[in-house]
Amino acid sequence: MSDTEYLTRAEAVLAAVERTVDDANDGDHDIDLERNGSVLTLTFENGSKIIVNLQPPMKEVWIAAKAGGFHYRFIDGEWRDTRTGTEFFSALTEYATQQAGLPITFNAP
């Protein structure tokens, strides 16, 4: 994958996360979202955080959550965990739901 293709796909991931948090905040959620360059920080009401950031040199997207740190690479049309193969948005849904204490669903762009 070229650098340009990576950045296009990875930025779409960040945009999808931002849209989902904005939509969730219109409902029952109160999630603080901060973007600093290619780093998104989601802060939940209980003070816990999830950080999603891009790693251009490795062409990966990373998640840091209470559950641990996870690296995702674009494989066969999806962002997949480099160790387990878990899809990025299903994993983020699980981690965010656990930390928020309310269901929240993230979907691929």
Curated annotation (Swiss-Prot):
Q: Do you know which Pfam families this protein is assigned to? A: Frataxin_Cyay (PF01491)
Q: Name one GO molecular function term.
A: ferrous iron binding
Which keywords label this protein?
A: Iron, Metal-binding
Does the record bear Iron in its keywords? Answer: yes
Biological-process GO terms, alphabetical: iron-sulfur cluster assembly
PROSITE patterns recorded for this chain?
Answer: FRATAXIN_1, FRATAXIN_2
Residues that span the membrane, as ranges:
none
UniProt cross-references to InterPro entries, sorted A to Z = CyaY (IPR047584), Frataxin/CyaY (IPR002908), Frataxin/CyaY_sf (IPR036524), Frataxin_CS (IPR020895)
What's in the GO CC field?
cytosol
Task of the protein: Involved in iron-sulfur (Fe-S) cluster assembly. May act as a regulator of Fe-S biogenesis.
The family line of this record is: Belongs to the frataxin family.
The protein's name? Iron-sulfur cluster assembly protein CyaY
Gene name for this UniProt entry: cyaY
